[in-house]
Amino acid sequence: YELHDVYRALSVLASEMDFIQSEVYKNSFFLGNRNDRILYYDCTNYYFEIEQEDGDKRYGKSKEHRPNPIIQMGLFTDGDGIPLAFSLFPGNQNEQKSLKPLETKILQQFGCEKFIYCSDAGLASEDNRVLNHMGQRAFIVTQSIKKLPAEDRAWALNKTDFKRLSDDKVVDITNLTENDKEQLFYKDEPFTTKKLHQRLIITYSPKYAAYQKAIRAEQISRAEKMVANGTLKKQRKNPNDPARFVN
């Protein structure tokens, strides 16, 4: 095959995209089992070096902070990180709305009906949670502590009543020792919103906490240098910008 053969095949691949994906999934079982009881979903986008919108190539929030029109892609992977299905949608569309059409295809065309949906907070809207509270599906998604009601936020940040995952022993995470460095701690409680009865799970990892502490220390050091050198930016576009530590 030569390059022009690949180009000629693109239109066929595009028109048969859904069928090809479902058949690849079904035939993959001939090579081994798929960990399809846990599905991860995320979105990204791709920019085009053009100066005007064209079709689904629309101006939107580029992951690479480019000022060009973009196409967005939603991707499901299985529990082992192997791609399952994807969809493309306009660059100016809210990515929250991309889940339902693709998940519907998985349910109808793939025959994959029993799974746990996992995503970050950006794709964990109330509607997406409701969608995955139906049938044989469930969900585990990230929840911003800052956006919790005051009572739940206070409970989440309270350092008492955690349990050690390895033995369920109740601990106060302010009294951890060096031996607990590799341990994981959690606590949970009922969490009810307008549409759903859920459970809110808070986890704490001493190892990850130390990692985040080191990152903050480095960012504070950079912020101090910015102040000293007079290079402090007035606008803070990135939540990880060191300048956020300076009032």
Q: Where are the language model's segments positioned?
A:
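Anion-binding and metal-coordination hotspots
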Residues: 1-247
